Each structure stands twice: as structure tokens, then as C-alpha cells.
A protein has these predicted regions:
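Conserved Class I S-adenosyl-L-methionine
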Residues: 174-251
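A conserved beta-strand element that flanks and buttresses the S-adenosyl-L-methionine
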Residues: 102
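Short alpha-helix
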Residues: 156-172
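Short catalytic micro-motifs in class I SAM-dependent methyltransferases
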Residues: 105-109
Length: 251
């Protein structure tokens, strides 16, 4: 089994750095509750239960899978139920055990993401979905940080494929747009996230390179605001079409 990235090290701050704005999250959840009513749902990478907890509280049957015990412990404290610790590419479920499956911000962390899609297709009867942000924001601060550490000699790339790139491989069967939304962020909050190395791409950056990258970012962005507009897309594929994505991308 290829190595897996566990988010235990950032479990305590994960929700505050990865969650959607409350208004946007409420709209997405409302759409999902309507769509998933009466379905048995598998969430791979359930983590702290950002999606699973409110869906479960709304009466949706969600089974979660994860490898990070600390992330799941936080979810359990929030009311998360029905979690299995397992590898996403080797799911411990019978074929066609679920109506619907989902991943969100998971596949880019998994080098054998094609095997994960194959497993999702195996255990799912109907559809797979993910929530994608379509935005005019280009993550300026994070991109500047990445450019600075790369210029200093450190290069890192995600081992897998971002869910947001799946539609480029195969046209979705159905998209539910949610939004648009307009938000204002304080750059200081993002600077703090970067300084704490909350993103997996930062975890192995040498200390000196990290420190030197943060200095010009603080000087440029401290005290400023970042505004952006975005729409969320709840994007669905029929289970059998995941096989097309997985097999067409085999090296």
C-alpha cells in the first residue's frame, strides 16, 4: 500500500482553516439533504465530519471512512457516528453497499487515486459526488509562498489528483450550482495559516526556507483584505463512469 498522509498533526485546527463560510455551507447542506434523502451514503475522508455530522443530524445515513484517528476524535466530539478506519483503496464493504459516495479534498493526497475511484465504483449503486469551488480567487498568498519556497530550492507536488480537476477528465452527469457568494478575508488569517504550516504541501519545507518565505509575505500582505466571488458546484457522476476516469488515466 502506498504511503498515506494522515492529518493528525493539524486535526485541532483543521475546521477553522478548511471550512466553507457558514452561509455557503448551509446552502450546500440544504441542497445535499434534498438530493440524498433516503440514500445510504459513504464519505471517504470523513475527517472531522464537516459534511457528515450535519447530514447525519438531518436524517441522512452517512458512513465515514478515514485513517486519521485525531481528526475522527474531533468529529466524534461533534456528534459524528458510524466511522470505519480503513484505506480508501481497499474498502471493507461488500459490492454495491451504498447508494452514493463522496470525497472532498481527498484525492489529491492519494497517489493511487485511480484505485480509490475503482473502489468507489465497486461499492456504489448510483452516483459519486464532490463539492467544487469555482472562483475568481487565485489563492494569491499560497501561490506566492509556493513560488518563494520553490525559488529557494524546495519543490513539492500533490501525489494525486484534485477533485476539482475531475470534470476535465470526464464530463459530469449532473451539476447542482450553489451560490454565487462574495466573501472578504483578512490576509492576516491566511498568513497565520501559512506560518503554522497547516497545508500538507508545507509539512516538509525546511525551517530556514519557510522562515525566509514568510518574511516578504508578511511585509506585503499584513493588514490587508482579500475579496473574491465564487460559486459552489455539487458535481455528480454515475458510478460506472468512474471506471472510465480511472482506466483512461492509467500510466
Amino acid at each position: 500500500m502506498p504511503g498515506r498522509l494522515s492529518f493528525d498533526r493539524v486535526a485541532a485546527i483543521y475546521d477553522e482553516t478548511r471550512s466553507l463560510a457558514p452561509r455557503a455551507m448551509a446552502r450546500v447542506l440544504a441542497a445535499l439533504v434534498d438530493e440524498l434523502h433516503g440514500k445510504r451514503v459513504l464519505e471517504i475522508g470523513v475527517g472531522t465530519g464537516r459534511y457528515a455530522v450535519p447530514l447525519q443530524k438531518s436524517g441522512i445515513r452517512v458512513i465515514g471512512v478515514d485513517i486519521s484517528r485525531k481528526m475522527v476524535e474531533i468529529g466524534l466530539a461533534k456528534g459524528l457516528r458510524d466511522v470505519v478506519f480503513a484505506d480508501a483503496a481497499r474498502l471493507p464493504f461488500r459490492s454495491k453497499s451504498f447508494d452514493v459516495a463522496t470525497t472532498n479534498h481527498v484525492l489529491h493526497l492519494i497517489s493511487d487515486w485511480r484505485d480509490v475511484l475503482m473502489e468507489i465504483a465497486r461499492v456504489t449503486r448510483e452516483t459519486y459526488f464532490t463539492v467544487i469551488e469555482r472562483s475568481d480567487r487565485i489563492d494569491t498568498l499560497k501561490r506566492e509562498y509556493d513560488a518563494l519556497v520553490k525559488g529557494a530550492g524546495y519543490v513539492w507536488s500533490h501525489p494525486g489528483l484534485h477533485e476539482k480537476d475531475l470534470p476535465g477528465l470526464l464530463k459530469p452527469d449532473f451539476i447542482m450550482p450553489v451560490g454565487p457568494f462574495r466573501e472578504t478575508l483578512l490576509a492576516d488569517a491566511t498568513l497565520d495559516e501559512l506560518d503554522r504550516r497547516t497545508y500538507s504541501s508545507q509539512w516538509d519545507v525546511p525551517d530556514e526556507i519557510h522562515r525566509k518565505a514568510m518574511e516578504p509575505l508578511r511585509a506585503k500582505w499584513r493588514g490587508k483584505e482579500i475579496q473574491w466571488s465564487y460559486t459552489l458546484e455539487v458535481t455528480f457522476w454515475r458510478w460506472e463512469r468512474l471506471l472510465e476516469i480511472a482506466t483512461s488515466q492509467r500510466p
